[in-house]
């Protein structure tokens, strides 16, 4: 038993003496390249156009990058957040629904009874209800990763607009 403990101690001492950490010559390592986490507004716009949406030009106002989309009688916007070098890590679908039917009670009922899309009410001469859906973009997924969130958005946006009393022209 004593021999085994002695042999283990000897092996550990030899291994430690050969370690680059104890000789002062640590091996340099290169950090792995980080993939861009996100999508560009141009590729998201091209993708939505390919799906049949009418996409407006990319705009930047007050530090926010976005474009408008018209589809099925509704106009909504895609906002981009967490952008570095033109690649954005978060996307937000957003729509403003105007009309006297957009009451605080209806917006609160929406938030209570529905998942995924969040909404808020703005009192003004013409009250509005704004609805939003936030999406975190993953590395390497490309625009295809927006397929399910866009399907949820396109399914629930008309429902929200209808519940707020909006009738498409």
Please tell me what each predicted stretch does.
Residues 1-4:
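Positively charged n-region of N-terminal signal peptides that target proteins for export
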Residues 59, 71, 80-82, 95-97, ...:
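A mature extracytoplasmic/lumenal domain signature
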Residues 14-25:
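C-terminal segment of classical bacterial N-terminal signal peptides
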Residues 116-161:
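A short, solvent-exposed beta-edge/loop patch
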Residues 159-169:
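Short, low-complexity, Pro/Ser/Thr/Gly-rich segments in the mature regions of secreted, periplasmic
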Residues 6-16:
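Hydrophobic helical h-region of N-terminal Sec-dependent signal peptides
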Residues 29-85:
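N-terminal secretory signal peptides
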Residues 35, 89-130:
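Short, internal acidic amphipathic alpha-helical interface segments
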């Amino acid at each position: 038993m004593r021999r085994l403990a002695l042999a283990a101690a000897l092996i550990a001492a030899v291994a430690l003496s050969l370690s680059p950490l104890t000789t002062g010559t640590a091996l340099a390592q290169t950090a792995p390249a980080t993939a861009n986490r996100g999508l560009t507004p141009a590729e998201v716009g091209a993708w939505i156009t390919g799906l049949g949406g009418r996409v407006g030009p990319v705009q930047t106002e007050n530090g926010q990058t976005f474009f408008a989309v018209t589809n099925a009688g509704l106009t909504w916007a895609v906002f981009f957040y967490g952008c570095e070098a033109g690649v954005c890590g978060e996307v937000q679908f957003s729509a403003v629904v105007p009309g006297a039917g957009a009451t605080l009670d209806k917006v609160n009922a929406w938030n209570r009874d529905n998942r995924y899309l969040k909404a808020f009410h703005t009192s003004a001469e013409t009250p509005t209800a704004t609805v939003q859906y936030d999406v975190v973009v993953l590395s390497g997924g490309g625009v295809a990763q927006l397929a399910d969130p866009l399907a949820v958005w396109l399914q629930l946006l008309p429902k929200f607009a209808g519940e707020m009393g909006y009738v498409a022209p």
